[in-house]
């Protein structure tokens, strides 16, 4: 099966590899390499050609060639160099282009390659990067430029683009700007001063090399007129503060009366400016436009704020655009009325001078176009204010008086004949009705103002004596869209809440009114935590699945109100009401925008227990949020011990999931008490090893004294102990156990990939893979018939401070004593005994070899399954990203709802797949451990066969030497050669003695090997069968669990679409 990633597929699934390519890949399989693979995307149109040279440029050797504090250098498989710096990879020596890409993901990949030995399953560290290292950047498509709209760079940018020009002009222009001081006696002279300054700047530009000026015009696609315009803008921006201050000083007499008039009509309302249509939908736009225009109010006093034409024009244009968006057609009369209220509420000074400044010093067309229309309209507004000042002041004063008393709660003795009510406002009811229907500068009606001011007396008086109908109450909205009842709920004043609720309770469409959201998207249901009685009265009318802007439903919002004294009563009643309304509570529906379920957010143990154990509440205990954290991880992160206790009592809890950073719950738990409790809960749930009450496992890693140490928890006789061991201690344990028992089969200790190979990006997945493989190593030792009760193993597991020297000396002495004891027994194997042992061992080897080959095939299949599952998860996330892109395409509301539901479905199913992503990898590691066990047993069984062959050779040599000794002793020789014959006889006898000792040793070792292997083969078969059954059972049970969760997710998705 080819890998989904094209680079991995080319490297390990090449359809027709050359011999050189195969040799290169084989070399990678026996060395420490990492692979940089480009991230997969559906629109992958990179022009990087997949050739062996390009592919091996993405394979780096982990051993770095050099380093400093900021970056590390790594050599590629074909001799090039890349730099790792923070989360980026940069090409260096050997690459044609300077390419910088980001690291987006990392994982361990085990290829199944047909042109590699079947026994070679090398684990590669894979870094997903945002692009190819060998690609040429695709040129950007040239944009079609409309010469009429193209503005080009500013003159200040031109000075930076052409430094030679900048150096020539900067000093001259700076001198001109610094020496400028206005001496104008009137505005006409001020205009002339500005023109002279602009002309002088243009002369400076014209004085430089004409060829350079022509080059600037051609390269920046400008005309001479456009260049002069940019010089004009540059001069104005540099002198703007001086020009502005001079203009304000010259126009003080003209601005003063108008500024006073604007300040006196601050409380003018939209319903009082003769709008031809309902003014309610204009209120929010007017408040927003006033906030925009308010930025001009500080221009005169704050020297740090800009006051150039570009800033002033942009501010005024933004104000107009806020009022006249594309969806609403606004004629001139309506715009003047709206701007009148905007100017009054913004309360800015020197507005006439602002208009004059733009008309006098702007380089844009100020008498035509949108800018001219805006200035003309503002002038019309200012003229209207000047002409109708007395009437507008009277209306504003009445509004101010009325709203001040509403805010102070002083409406009990309302009198129409107040001294402040000057001419312009009559006593008839029609005039005062406009005051009662007015809005304050914040856009609030009198009712809304009374509620937000928390004035019950004002609200009571308004409702009882001022003629407000139920329709007025239902239609009343704040600028942010809050209803009167929602605003009342925010005050947490029960009297005000009851007062408003009593006025709307009997309306025809109360459910719709209760579902209206405010600026946060929250309806009445989201504020139930304020009032238990309100929940009891209208809880059945609430949409319990409605979400606010944070994705919270009324139930999830209520569950977060921990500080409420009636928290448990609120939750109990809300759950009952929600169940009555919906029939079943599915916690997947009540997730917020960050993917947090109620199990993530609720920290109260009683509420959490109710959610987990209620028969009508559907809950996925292990559902992750968008950061990949399950509820158990979230509570472990914040050390919520009581919540963890409740979750750990649930049999559905899973400790295996990892978050988006690759951290599991044991990595996340930093608090000592929390970590110890999690360890205790996890270890208590694990089954015993064999028939004993023993179990051990590596739960986390720590850095101690600059070395990676593994925290090993051991359960024995109901007690839990912990030790920290570096990887070197595992090597020590393997070495000396095998040294003491050389005839036993021994599990292999694989050399791990360094998780800190790239220090800027340590790999949690590799670290957890190390945990798993070392756990399986210890598990095999504890199930081993010989080593399970070995004192060295248990001393290593239970005692933290051990002396390697002492243990090595003790093991060596034990082995020497055993050899001495064996030498005391005189055993010589004859041919029948050797045939018997050889037959037994050969048969066992044949059977174990068949099991080894079957296990190897199963391991290969499990690796394929693991890789396919990873690709499946990747493809699922790609599909989700593609669905998310559809959101950007405008469409009808039903279509947008379908896409939103589909995207949510993708997230739900993606979380289900991702959370079970570790299951195939764990299964593959289990099978790999069984294969290593079978390999070790095969090697152990092959040893006595080799010993028997050697023994037969030694026996044949002994017969030959004995025959030679007899022949020499019977041979007659001359007296002169007598000493030579005696010397040769002594040598042969010495060789006979050595051979007899070797035969004796081989016989003893072969016999011991037979006895040892005969006693261990049963244990091997039992352990192999038990572990294989357990691994299959685990992955099957996890898959069944996953499919049950998937079925629930699919039912929820079906409910959304139907």
From Swiss-Prot:
UniProt protein name: UPF0507 protein YALI0E18612g
GO molecular function term, any single one: phosphatidylinositol binding
Residues of the VPS9 domain: 252-394
Superkingdom per UniProt: Eukaryota
Biological-process GO terms, alphabetical: early endosome to late endosome transport
Family statement drawn from the similarity comment of this UniProt entry: Belongs to the UPF0507 family.
GO cellular component: early endosome; late endosome; plasma membrane; transport vesicle; tubular endosome
